[in-house]
From Swiss-Prot:
Its main location: nucleus. Residues 1-10, 1063-1075 have a biased composition (Polar residues). Specifically expressed in embryonic epithelia. Pfam families: BACK, BTB. SUPFAM superfamilies: POZ domain. Residues 413-479 form the BACK domain. This is BTB/POZ domain-containing protein 7. CDD domains: BACK_BTBD7, BTB1_POZ_BTBD7, BTB2_POZ_BTBD7.
Length: 1130
C-alpha cells in the first residue's frame, strides 16, 4: 500500500482476499480512475439508477394509474431534464461567456482530481519485504549462527529452511537452539560481503548490495546449482504459514482475565492454541516484539530454551477474539487480509457476537467484521492489517451500509480515511441517496459536509427540495417524541395518522434548516422560475432573493455563473456532470457556427484582491510558496505543538515533508490545476499540503507546518530562501517568498539600479558591520543575470545602467566615528551596498563632526521597505519622461571630462540617481521672473519639481563653502537633470560604458529666454547623505578638516521647521558669512591639481548656483498667494 494514490492498486488491494466480486469496484459503482472525474466523460456512472424504476415498473399491476406511469417515466429521464435546463440557460449567452463557464468547470475538475488524491492519501504501511529486511539487520529472535570465513551470521532457522533447500538440509542436522554451523561453499569467488548479500536475498527476495558479480550469469548459475533456486518470497512465506515448520511460539486465548494475569493456571482452561514463529510476529508487530523482549529480560526465555518447549503467549479474548487470530497470522505471513479464513476457523463467541444474539440481529456482515478487526490491528500496531480492513470497509460502502459506515468512521476510534471515502460516496451518489429512505437517516453534520462540496452530483433545485423534506421529517420526529406515551403505538399517534404539511411549525422548521440552507447555491437553481424556490420563499424559509434579482453597479443584472466585477462574492457552480457535459456541447456548437478559437480570448476574472492590504493578509494562506514568519522577540523558543494539540515532528521528517511538497508542486497534474484556477492558488496549495500531511500520518489541522515551517524551525533552510529574505532582521516583519526568479534580484549588483522615487530623499541610514550580515552576503550564490525586471516591480530600475556597472571589489571594513548610531542595513540603499561617492563620504564626515543630539536625528527611511507598491506608483509617473534627457546630459559630461582629465580617480564614477515626479503643471516663465524677488529658506514639500527637490544656493552675502567642504563637482546623487555649466563634464571610469551608447534619441527641454537650458534654472537640492564609506582612504582626513570648522556648520532647528523640513534647507547660516577665501582656494587647488579646466568650471558653477538660489527661493515662497503648495503625487 503506497503512501500516495498514484501508487495505490486500482480497485482491490492484494492484501484483501475472499470475495472476488466485491473487489471489482472500489466505492459503490465507480472506480477511482482520473478519467472518471474529468469533464471529458461522465463524472460518475448512475446507469444502475436508471434501471431501478424500470424493474419496479415490471412488477406494477395493471391497475396502476396513468399518473403514476408518467411520474416513473419522468424520474427515469431526470438527466435529460438537467441537460435541457442548462441548454435553455445558455441559449442567450455570448460565446465568450460560455467559454468562460467551461473554463471554470475545467478548473473545478482539476481541483477535484487533487481533492480525490488527497482523500486517498494515507501513511505507507510497512510491507513484508521491508519488515524482513529489518529483521535480518536487527537480528532479534535468532536461533542459529552461521560461521563463514571466521565471521558469525545470526539467522533464523525457519526462514532459511523455508526459502532454500540447501539450508533446509544443512539445518536439520543441528536442531538444537543456538547451534553454530560452519559454512563450506564450493562456489569460487564468494567472500563475506557476497555471502551476506545472499542471506539478505533469502530474507527479502532482493540483493542488499550493488555488486557487479551478481550480473555475471556464470556465478548465478553456480549458486543456483549449489543452493537451489528459491521461490518468490510470498509463496515461500505462505508455505511457512501453512506447515509451521520449526515453530517456536504458541498463542493461547482465555476469557478468564485472572488466568491471563497469573500465567500458569490450569491449562485445561486454555482453548485451542495457534502456532507461530517469533521472528515473524516480532518483525510485523511492535506489540509482540516488545512482549518477547520483555520475556528475555526477565529470564523467562531461558527457561523455555532449557526445557526446549515453545514460548507460550496467553491473550485475553475480550481484547483479541480468537476468531480473528488466524486472520491476523495469515496477514503477517502474506500481507493479505482474507476474511474467508475467519469463517473456516472455529468461532468462540466474542463480545460482539453475544451482543448481536441478544439484540436479535443476524450474523455480522463483512464490513462489521472488518471494523472490529481494524481496532485489533491498531492495538497490535500492525498497519498493514489496519489498511487492509479499511479497504474492505470502503469496498462495502453502498446505500445499505452508508449510514453505518458514516457513524462508525465519525467516532474518534473510527478511521478518518474510511470517513473520507464514505463522504465521497455520499457526494457522488446524492441524487440516488435523496430518493431513498436512507436520506432521512443522515445526520445534520453529514448533510452539511456534503452540501458544502463543489463536487456534489445533484442539481441545486433537488438539493433545496430534499433538504426541506429532510427538515420536515426531522420535525415530525420531534413531534412524535413530544407526544404522551399513552398515545404511542395507537391509532391516534403521530406515527400512525401522520402530520400534514400545513400543521408543521414554520419557525421550528426554519430553526432545523438554519445551518443547511445557506449552503444551497440559490443563484444556480435551474430553471430560473423554479417552483421549489418560489415555494420556499413563500414559506419564509429563504429570506433573501438570489443575486440575479439584484441590480449591479452598471444597472444591469449580474451573472452568478461567471466571475464579474461589481457582482459581489463569487460562488463557483458545482461540478454537476449533466451541466458540464451540456455546457461543453453548447460551446462546441457555438464555436462551429459563430467564431474561431482566436476570438475566444478574454480576460478571466480571478480572485486576486484589488487592495494592497488584502494581499499581505491573505499571503500565508493563499501563496503556494512557503512563507517565512520569524519568531517574535518575546518568544524564547519555537513552539513544540501545532494547532494546540499536534506535536511538531522531528526535523528530518519535516524536511522529507517539504521535499515531498516540492515534488508534488512540480507534477503535471498540480501545474495544470494552478494554470486553470486563476487566483485560486490557495485552494490548490491546500489540497497538496493536506495530501502530504496525510501521507505522513498527521492531521489536517497541522497545515501550518507546511505553510510556515520557519516558525517551528527558525534556524533551518528549506530550499526556497532568497537573498532579500536573508537580509531581514529576525523578528522585524513577516515575509512571504512569493517573488519568482524572473522578478526578484538575486545578486548584489542588481541593487545598483534601485531608485526609490520618494521625494525628498530619505535621511541618513547606517548599515552595521555585523559578522552575520557579511556571512549572509558571502553565502549568496552567483546566478546568471536575468532579464530586466518589468515596471511592475516595486522599485523601478534604470535599465540603461545595467550593463555599465562592474562589481565592486571588497574594501576594508567601515570605520564608524564616535557618536554615529549604527542602524540596520537598508536593502533599498544603493550606496550602502558597495558603491560610495565623494559627496557621500564628505557629507558623512561633515555630519559626524557636526553631530546633533539623537532627539533631532531624522527617522530611518522605512517607507520603501513597508510600502514598495506606493513607491512604484510615484516613480512610474516620471520614469520615462525624465530618464532619457537626463542620461543624455550625463553622457556629454562624461565624455568631455574624460578628454580633459588625465586620470580620473576611481571614486568619480557615475552613480544611479533618484528620479522625481513631473506630473504637475509647470509655472510660466513670467511667474518665475516674479518669484525671483522673494527669497525664502523653506522648501515646498509638496512640490516635486527639480528645483523644489534641491535647496537654494546661498547668496553671495552668505558663507558658501567650497567643494573641499564636502561638495563634489561630479554628477548629483539624486537627479539626472543638472547639467554642468561652461562645459564641465562628468567622469566615467575607463571600464564603464557611457549611457549615451545605451540610450538613443534624447529629448531636450526648450531653452529659456536668457539662453540657458530650461533645466539649468532649477538648481536641485544637494543633500548631505551620511553613508558608510567602505572604500574611502581619505575619510579620516576629510573628517579632520570638517571637524576644524564643525561649529560653524551647526544650526539648530528654527521655530517654523518640522521633523520633515529640518535639514532640507540651507545649512549655511548667515552668521558665518566671512570665510577666508585663501582656505577656499587652497582646498580647491589641492583637489583639482590634475585638471586646470576643472577649476574654471568650478568658479562658473558657483556663480550659477548663487543665481539659481534666488530664483528657486522666490518661486517656492509659501506666503505668496499666487504660488500655493502643489498637490502631492502621493
Amino acid at each position: 500500500m503506497g503512501a500516495n494514490a498514484s501508487n495505490y492498486p486500482h480497485s482491490c488491494s492484494p492484501r484483501v482476499g475472499g470475495n472476488s466480486q466485491a473487489q471489482q469496484t472500489f466505492i459503490g459503482t465507480s472506480s477511482y480512475s482520473q478519467q472518471g472525474y474529468g469533464c471529458e466523460s461522465k463524472l460518475y456512472s448512475l446507469d444502475h439508477g436508471h434501471e431501478k424504476p424500470q424493474d419496479k415498473k415490471k412488477r406494477t399491476s395493471g391497475l396502476a394509474t396513468l399518473k403514476k406511469k408518467f411520474i416513473k417515466r419522468r424520474k427515469s429521464n431526470r438527466s435529460a431534464d438537467h441537460a435541457k435546463q442548462m441548454r435553455e440557460l445558455l441559449s442567450g449567452w455570448d460565446v465568450r461567456d460560455v467559454n468562460a463557464l467551461v473554463e471554470e468547470y475545467e478548473g473545478t475538475s482539476a481541483l477535484k482530481e487533487l481533492s480525490l488524491q488527497a482523500s486517498l492519501a494515507r501513511p505507507e504501511a510497512r510491507t513484508l519485504q521491508k519488515d524482513m529486511a529489518d529483521l535480518y539487520e536487527d537480528k532479534y529472535c535468532t536461533d542459529v549462527d552461521l560461521i563463514f570465513q571466521e565471521t558469525c551470521f545470526p539467522v533464523h532457522r525457519a526462514i532459511l529452511a523455508a526459502r532454500c533447500p540447501f539450508f533446509k538440509t544443512l539445518l536439520s542436522s543441528s536442531p538444537e537452539y543456538g547451534a553454530e554451523i560452519i559454512m563450506d561453499i564450493s562456489t569460487a569467488g564468494i567472500d563475506m560481503p557476497m555471502f551476506s548479500a545472499l542471506l539478505h536475498y533469502l530474507y527479502t527476495g532482493e540483493f542488499g548490495m550493488e555488486d557487479s558479480r551478481f550480473q555475471n550469469v556464470d556465478i548465478l548459475v553456480q549458486l543456483s546449482e549449489e543452493f537451489g533456486t528459491p521461490n518468490p518470497l510470498d509463496v515461500d512465506m505462505r508455505g511457512l504459514f501453512d506447515y509451521m515448520c520449526y515453530y517456536d511460539v504458541v498463542l493461547s486465548f482465555s476469557s478468564d482475565s485472572e488466568l491471563v494475569e497469573a500465567f500458569g493456571g490450569n491449562q485445561n482452561c486454555l482453548d485451542e492454541e495457534l502456532k507461530a514463529h517469533k521472528a515473524i510476529i516480532s518483525a510485523r508487530s511492535p506489540f509482540f516484539r516488545n512482549l518477547l523482549q520483555r520475556r528475555i529480560r526477565t529470564g523467562e526465555e531461558i527457561t523455555d530454551r532449557t526445557l526446549r518447549t515453545p514460548t507460550r503467549i496467553i491473550l485475553d479474548e475480550s481484547i483479541i477474539p480468537k476468531k480473528y487470530a488466524k486472520v491476523i497470522l495469515h496477514c503477517m505471513y502474506t500481507d493479505v487480509v482474507d476474511l474467508s479464513v475467519l469463517h473456516c476457523s472455529p468461532s468462540v463467541g466474542s463480545l460482539s457476537e453475544v451482543q448481536a444474539l441478544v439484540a436479535g440481529k443476524p450474523n455480522m456482515t463483512r464490513a462489521e467484521e472488518a471494523m472490529e478487526l481494524y481496532h485489533i490491528a491498531l492495538f497490535l500496531e500492525f498497519n498493514m492489517l489496519a489498511q487492509g480492513c479499511e479497504d474492505i470497509i470502503a469496498e462495502s460502502i453502498s446505500l445499505d451500509t452508508l449510514i453505518a459506515v458514516l457513524k462508525w468512521s465519525s467516532h474518534p476510534y473510527g478511521s478518518k480515511w474510511v470517513h473520507r471515502q464514505a463522504v465521497h460516496f455520499l457526494c457522488e451518489e446524492l441524487s440516488q441517496v435523496m430518493t431513498s429512505d436512507v436520506f432521512y437517516e443522515l445526520s445534520k453534520d453529514h448533510l452539511l459536509t456534503a452540501i458544502q462540496s463543489d463536487y456534489l452530483q445533484a442539481s441545486e433545485q433537488d438539493i433545496l427540495k430534499y433538504l426541506i423534506k429532510w427538515g420536515e421529517h426531522q420535525l415530525m420526529k420531534r413531534i412524535a417524541d413530544r407526544e404522551p406515551n399513552l398515545l404511542s403505538g395507537t391509532a391516534h399517534s403521530v406515527n400512525k395518522r401522520g402530520v400534514k404539511r400545513r400543521d408543521l411549525d414554520i419557525e421550528e422548521l426554519r430553526e432545523i434548516l438554519s445551518s443547511l440552507l445557506p449552503f444551497v447555491r440559490i443563484e444556480h437553481i435551474l430553471p430560473i422560475n423554479s417552483e421549489v424556490l418560489s415555494d420556499a420563499m413563500k414559506r419564509g424559509l429563504i429570506s433573501t432573493p438570489p443575486s440575479d434579482m439584484l441590480p449591479t453597479a452598471e444597472g444591469g443584472k449580474s451573472n452568478a455563473w461567471l466571475r464579474q466585477k461589481n457582482a459581489g462574492i463569487y460562488v463557483r457552480p458545482r461540478l454537476f456532470s449533466p451541466y458540464v457535459e451540456e455546457a461543453k456541447s453548447v460551446l462546441d456548437e457555438m464555436m462551429v457556427e459563430q467564431t474561431d478559437l482566436v476570438r475566444l480570448r478574454m480576460v478571466r476574472m480571478s480572485n486576486v484582491p484589488d487592495t494592497l492590504y488584502m494581499v499581505s493578509n491573505a499571503m500565508p494562506q493563499c501563496c503556494h510558496m512557503i512563507s517565512h514568519q520569524q519568531i517574535s522577540s518575546n518568544q524564547s523558543s519555537p513552539p513544540s505543538v501545532v494547532a494546540n494539540e499536534i506535536p511538531v515532528p522531528r526535523l528530518l521528517i519535516m524536511k522529507d515533508m517539504v521535499r515531498r511538497l516540492q515534488e508534488l508542486r512540480h507534477t503535471e497534474q498540480v501545474q495544470r490545476a494552478y494554470a486553470l484556477n486563476c487566483g485560486e492558488g490557495a485552494t490548490v496549495s491546500y489540497e497538496i499540503q493536506i495530501r502530504v500531511l496525510r501521507e505522513f500520518g498527521l492531521a489536517d489541522a497541522a497545515a501550518e507546518l507546511l505553510q510556515n515551517p520557519h516558525k517551528f524551525f527558525p534556524d533551518e533552510r528549506f530550499g526556497d530562501e532568497s537573498p532579500l529574505l536573508t537580509m531581514r532582521q529576525p523578528g522585524r516583519c513577516r515575509v512571504n517568498s512569493t517573488p519568482t526568479a524572473e522578478t526578484m534580484f538575486t545578486d548584489l549588483d542588481s541593487f545598483v539600479a534601485f531608485h526609490p522615487p520618494l521625494p525628498p530623499p530619505p535621511p541618513p541610514y547606517h548599515p552595521p558591520a555585523t559578522p552575520i550580515h557579511n556571512q549572509l552576503k558571502a553565502g549568496w550564490k552567483q546566478r546568471p543575470p536575468s532579464h530586466h525586471p518589468s515596471r511592475s516591480f516595486s522599485y523601478p530600475c534604470n535599465h540603461s545602467l545595467f550593463h555599465c556597472r562592474t562589481a565592486p571589489k571588497p574594501g576594508p571594513p567601515p570605520v564608524y566615528l564616535p557618536g554615529v548610531k549604527v542602524a540596520p542595513p537598508d536593502c533599498t540603499n544603493t550606496t550602502g551596498l558597495g558603491r560610495q561617492t565623494v559627496a557621500a563620504a564628505a557629507a558623512a564626515a561633515a555630519a559626524s563632526a557636526a553631530i546633533i543630539p539623537e532627539k533631532q536625528v531624522c527617522p530611518q527611511p522605512v517607507l520603501n521597505d513597508l510600502m514598495p507598491d506606493i513607491a512604484m506608483g510615484v516613480s512610474t509617473l516620471s520614469l520615462k519622461d525624465r530618464r532619457l534627457p537626463e542620461l543624455a546630459a550625463d553622457t556629454e559630461l562624461c565624455q568631455t571630462v574624460s578628454e580633459a582629465g588625465t586620470g580620473p580617480p576611481q571614486h568619480l564614477s557615475c552613480i544611479p540617481q533618484r528620479h522625481t515626479n513631473t506630473s504637475r503643471k509647470k509655472p510660466t516663465l513670467e511667474q518665475k521672473a516674479d518669484g525671483r524677488e522673494n527669497q525664502q529658506e523653506y522648501p515646498d514639500l509638496y512640490d516635486f519639481s527639480n528645483a523644489a527637490c534641491r535647496p537654494s544656493t546661498p547668496a553671495p552675502g552668505r558663507h558658501s563653502p567650497s567643494p573641499a567642504h564636502g561638495r563634489y563637482f561630479g554628477p548629483d546623487l539624486y537627479s539626472h537633470n543638472k547639467a554642468s555649466p561652461n562645459g564641465l563634464k562628468s567622469v566615467y571610469l575607463p571600464g564603464q560604458t557611457s549611457p549615451k551608447k545605451q540610450e538613443d534619441p534624447r529629448r531636450e527641454y526648450p531653452p529659456s529666454p536668457d539662453g540657458h537650458p530650461h533645466r539649468q534654472k532649477r538648481e536641485p537640492i544637494r543633500l548631505d547623505v551620511v553613508e558608510q564609506p567602505p572604500q574611502r582612504p581619505d575619510f579620516p582626513s576629510a573628517a579632520s578638516e570638517n571637524a576644524s570648522h564643525g561649529p560653524a556648520h551647526v544650526r539648530a532647528r528654527t521655530a517654523v521647521e518640522t521633523d520633515l523640513t529640518f535639514g532640507l534647507t540651507s545649512n549655511r547660516p548667515p552668521s558665518h558669512s566671512a570665510c577666508s577665501s585663501e582656505v577656499l582656494e587652497e582646498r580647491s587647488s589641492r583637489r583639482l591639481t590634475d585638471s586646470e579646466p576643472l577649476g574654471h568650471g568650478a568658479h562658473q558653477r558657483n556663480a550659477d548656483l548663487e543665481r539659481g538660489d534666488s530664483i528657486s527661493r522666490g518661486r517656492r515662497s509659501p506666503s505668496k498667494p499666487d504660488f500655493l503648495y502643489k498637490k502631492s503625487a502621493l
